[in-house]
Amino acid sequence: MYGAVNDVEVSGTGTIGQQLTERLRINATTAGTYNYTLNVIDKNVDFPLLASQSISVKVVDAASANSGMSKKVMFLGDSITDRNFFEPEVNNLFTGDSMSIQLVGSRGSGSNLHEGRAGWGTSDYVYSQSFNGRDNAFFNPSSSTFDFSYYVAQKGIIPDVIIIMLGTNDTWRTHAGTTSSDNIQFMVNSIKSYNPNIKIGIALNIPPALSYDASGEQNTFVNPLVNRKKLLQIPEGILNTFSNKETNGIYIVPVTTNIDTENNFQTTTENLNSRNTTQVQRVIDPIHPALPGYQQIADSMYAFLKNLVF
């Protein structure tokens, strides 16, 4: 876990965790399922416990997990997917692995295919034929909605696993009578209607950069605290809707827990201020990570795919 706000401390108790200054590190070396308790503590007022959650951490042997399997994987998302930075690293992680994957989709190039569309929110995929200069490959003109069966008929692409990572752009827009979770549920129902055996991962949209330096770069004049709250409400809704659905082949992909929001976002070097030439690093994009951040997304995708039971 990275980038805790300054007023709280996230700590844990268990047999495999290492408490560092800026994060908790899970450092198990032996395959198994480990019990762990996460605690959020207020550092300013007598250290009260604000929240606590018991979790199970499953660790698999990378050398043998899903050995011999070959699966087609589709990433469906917004600009985080469309920029095509984490997909090459996913392929790299599976190079020489006992499990092989093939990334599929109508966008991207070479082996780094996907279904990412910059600027898109969940309702764009469900209800829009095109948006932001990009066509919706899943849009059925007859029903005017997302239709996975139509997509397969048109594209001939049939994945074994679909990982949906959407919600960030929903923060900036209001949807008439729907929420991000409602729209993702619509997409999931359509996919499962085509083939209930397709595994679906719902990736929690990544949090914004810890620094407020870039809050004026996008959505100027919007309070960064308000944006941060909205960005956190979306994964909360996703968790409420899709948790504990593993028996239905629906899984949460906790990408959000593996992003270093303090150190792995894009920065520039500039003067401290107009009268001080001391050089400082400032975040220039609060939404899109730097390459190390995308590589952390790839790490999460790799771990999810290696842990899947087919």
Protein language model regions, located:
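Loop/turn elements at helix/coil->beta-strand transitions in domains of secreted/extracellular proteins
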Residues: M69-K72, D97-Q102, I157-I163, T168, ...
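Conserved SGNH/GDSL esterase-like catalytic core that processes O-acyl groups on lipids
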Residues: M74, D82-T178
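Surface-exposed intrinsically disordered loops and tails
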Residues: S111-F146, D213-V222, N244, V253, ...
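Active-site-proximal beta-strand/loop segments in catalytic clefts of secreted hydrolases
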Residues: L76-I80, V104-S109, I164-N169, I191, ...
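Histidine-centered active-site loop/cap adjacent to the catalytic His
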Residues: N273-F310
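Beta-strand-enriched, solvent-exposed domains that form extended recognition/catalytic surfaces
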Residues: M1-N66
